[in-house]
Curated annotation (Swiss-Prot):
Record-listed substrate binding positions: 348, 384, 388, 417, 445
GO biological process, alphabetically ordered: lysine biosynthetic process via diaminopimelate
Keywords (A to Z) from UniProt: Acetylation, Amino-acid biosynthesis, Chloroplast, Decarboxylase, Lyase, Lysine biosynthesis, Plastid, Pyridoxal phosphate, Transit peptide
Name this protein carries in UniProt: Diaminopimelate decarboxylase 2, chloroplastic
Quaternary structure and partners: Homodimer.
Pathway, per record: Amino-acid biosynthesis; L-lysine biosynthesis via DAP pathway; L-lysine from DL-2,6-diaminopimelate: step 1/1
InterPro entries: Ala_racemase/Decarboxylase_C (IPR009006), DAP_deCOOHase_LysA (IPR002986), De-COase2_C (IPR022643), De-COase2_CS (IPR022657), De-COase2_N (IPR022644), De-COase2_pyr-phos_BS (IPR022653), Orn/DAP/Arg_de-COase (IPR000183), PLP-binding_barrel (IPR029066)
Enzyme superclass (EC): lyase
Protein purpose: Specifically catalyzes the decarboxylation of meso-diaminopimelate (meso-DAP) to L-lysine.
Transit peptide boundaries: 1-50
Active site: 416 (proton donor)
Organism taxonomic ancestry: Eukaryota, Viridiplantae, Streptophyta, Embryophyta, Tracheophyta
GO cellular component, as recorded: chloroplast; chloroplast stroma; plasma membrane
Family in the record: Belongs to the Orn/Lys/Arg decarboxylase class-II family. LysA subfamily.
Species this protein is from: Arabidopsis thaliana
Name of the encoding gene: LYSA2
Length: 489
């Protein structure tokens, strides 16, 4: 893109350039058939561990989790419904290939739960675009007042295309390029400083763009979020953030560059799939200590940015998990006591439970010791089980004949890898060929991590509207799309 390659020579706003890339809104067809150096003493290195937190939150109740009830439900007749619309009917109308199906009303309900929790607190709900980067979903979240958390230059460009207010956007990352930082400076987004070289690049970007950059310092709090190591981002071994014993160096550097940098806050990020909200309070207590010290050195910081996402009930086992209200209540008084603006970065908890990945059964087989349901979807479209050994609930969309044997299956795809599975040892009725099968809670880190391995093309996406009608919100990729990368070579 010309807008990308010419940043350094063209410091003017990129918005006008991006307009030529606006998607044709009419191309997303509507289907009418169904109604993110000082003299002061060095700061003491502090460490907190969630496992020994003394600030336990109130007991969670099933009522507190009501905002996150599942939008996909089985009826007494054995059919799966999304917002009252039968999934089997949708399968019979759309393209005969795997697809992602969302509930637009559930996206709204999830965001409203955060907005309700944040009442009385100056805040920004920064949706983590990495969780799901569908443009139509971004536009919907923006229309509901969401900000955006970005971890790449292209996510920043997409946020601008979706109409997000740049002053409600936060640019994270441990390897931000100079070109992307120039764009961030031009547009006025917040930038979280991750390292010494990152700060130097932000200073250079400010000089190129001619604009002062609002920055927050990403401090690694060394908090144990008790999650999968691949999604833990706030412990001492993480590649992200500033070591707290180095904080004074960064404060001195910001003071040395008053034209380029304005320090407005502090940031930490804990990880993903967090189910113990005391971790957030432990981190907030530590971050407040840092903010108090930063203010004592003359900085007028007004933002506390706590990143890290709530977990969800992937097992569909009735687990009572913390809600946005539970989360915010752990830090509310701390934030208010320091007159801070709170920035949070939900991704998974906003979008995961709004979607399922819909597949067709190609056939059933056995190797003598293990049974397999082979489907047309695969690790190419949904890699979480293969990559993280993650569990996502699987079920059939319609009832099977009474005589269908119920047994344990591995649910696998057609990709030429033994790691190509969506679920292992799942007890299911033996499905007939062509039956519909869904992988639940597929709204986050599924489509955004999809690939074209084995030339499996990325699938289409649809959502169920408030009135029950179905809208295509992303076209399927095709073989012709793949060939375009080689045109003129």
């Amino acid at each position: 893109m010309a807008a990308v390659t010419q940043f350094l020579s063209q410091p003017s706003s990129i918005r006008g350039t991006l307009n030529q890339y606006q998607l044709n809104q009419t191309s997303l067809s509507r289907i009418p058939f169904l109604s993110l150096k000082s003299t002061l003493k060095p700061l003491k290195r502090l460490s907190v561990k969630a496992a020994v937190s003394q600030n336990s939150t109130k007991t969670l109740t099933k009522e507190s989790a009501s905002s996150f009830d599942h939008c996909f439900k089985k009826s007494s007749d054995g059919f799966l419904y999304c917002e009252g619309t039968k999934v089997q009917d949708i399968m019979e109308t759309v393209e005969k290939r795997p697809f992602y199906l969302y509930s637009k009303p559930q996206i709204t309900r999830n965001l409203e739960a955060y907005k309700e929790a944040l009442e009385g607190v100056r805040s920004v709900i920064g949706y983590a675009i990495k969780a799901n980067n569908n443009l139509k979903i971004l536009e919907h979240l923006r229309s509901l007042g969401c900000g955006a958390v970005l971890v790449s230059g292209n996510e920043l460009r997409l946020a601008l295309l979706a109409g997000f207010d740049p002053t409600k956007c936060i640019f994270n990352g441990n390897g931000k390029s100079l070109e992307d930082l120039v764009l961030a400076a031009q547009e006025g987004v917040f930038v979280n400083v991750d390292s010494e070289f990152d700060l130097n690049n932000i200073v250079e970007a400010s000089r190129i763009s001619g604009k002062q950059v609002n920055v927050l310092l990403r401090i690694n709090p060394d908090v144990d979020p008790q999650v999968h190591p691949y999604v833990a981002t706030g412990n001492k071994n993480s590649k992200f953030g500033i070591r707290n014993e180095k904080l004074q160096w960064f404060l001195d550097e910001v003071k040395a560059h008053p034209k380029e940098l304005k320090l407005v806050g502090a940031h930490c990020h804990l990880g993903s799939t967090i189910t113990k909200v005391d971790i957030f309070r432990d981190a907030a207590v530590l971050m407040i200590e840092y903010i108090d010290e930063i203010r004592r050195q003359g900085f007028e910081v007004s933002y506390l940015n706590i990143g890290g996402g709530l977990g969800i009930d992937y097992y569909h086992a009735g687990a009572v998990l913390p809600t946005p209200m539970d989360l915010i209540n752990t830090v509310r008084e701390l934030v208010l006591s320091r007159d801070l603006n709170l920035i949070i970065e939900p991704g998974r908890s906003l979008i995961a439970n709004t979607c399922c990945f819909v597949n067709h059964v190609t056939g059933v087989k056995t190797n003598g010791t293990k049974n397999f349901i082979v489907i047309d979807g695969s690790m190419a479209e949904l890699i979480r089980p293969s990559l993280y050994d993650a569990y996502q609930h699987i079920e059939l969309v319609s009832p099977t004949p009474p005589e269908a044997e119920v047994t344990k299956f591995d649910v696998v795809g057609p990709v030429c890898e033994s790691a190509d599975f969506l679920g292992k040892d799942r007890e299911l009725p033996t499905p007939p060929q062509g039956a519909g099968l869904v992988v639940h809670d597929a709204g986050a880190y599924c489509m955004s991590m999809a690939s074209t391995y084995n030339l499996k093309m990325r699938p289409p996406e649809y959502w169920v509207e408030e009135d029950g009608s179905i809208t295509k919100i992303r076209h399927a990729e095709t073989f012709d799309d793949h060939l375009r990368f080689f045109e003129g070579l």
